[in-house]
Amino acid sequence: MNKTIIIRGGGDLATGTISCLHQCGYQVLVLEIAKPTAIRRSVAFSEAMYDGETEVEGIKARKITQFSETKACWQDGIIPIICDEKAEAVKAVPHFAFVDAAIAKRNLGTTIDMADYVIGLGPGFTAGVDVDVVIETKRGHRLGRIIREGQAIANTGIPGIIGGYGKERVIHSENAGVFHGIAHIGDLVKKGDLIAKVDDAPVYATLDGVLRGILRDGLPVPEHFKIADIDPRLSERENCFTISDKASAIAGGVLRAICIYENELRSGEGRK
């Protein structure tokens, strides 16, 4: 049986799913854009697009330039990641499942015929129409649930509450320009501390806490672009360097959906 799963996106939430499926014995191929913009970079396999190779919780991902390089990575226990914005891998690499984990809040071109089993994470997908199932990505009671009909909860634009803070903990650019980071992931910051600049415009910490994520230095950003994330829980600095509870819950939903699909195939009930 084919054990290959193609995953669109290598950001921090996608990384939870990628890591989970890899550890469960699936061969995972990650598709990314040329210059990813993850801010929780210490736990995002997408960083391999810049550094060539990255490691999250002991699992390595390696940038490749040809689909033919995937097998060598899998044999070495490494996750291959390639620049493939149009998902050409769907035609080039035999696989049984496709997961759109870009968390773009919209469909970037995923269709239900891209694999035997197609999963979409978060809003932007309709189960039974452009994907087989959707996984809920909004914090709360339904996080990680499998949706077989309809869509995930719509994006509100308001971050989930952590330590009593919601929108205050996520920082967006006030102007377009080139991002220049000053603080680093894991730094303890105070409200009002200078943590970055966009061109010459200063970016200040919005609350006291741990800088959980900050955009890669030197990237151009538009106005109102997400550039940093502060965790108000000062005692949990190590969380900056491990896959989040949210990412793990989503990963559990994806794994459960795939296991259900495989069981249905064995019993003759699944779509082939």
Language-model features: where?
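Well-ordered secondary-structure scaffolds
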Residues: M1-K272
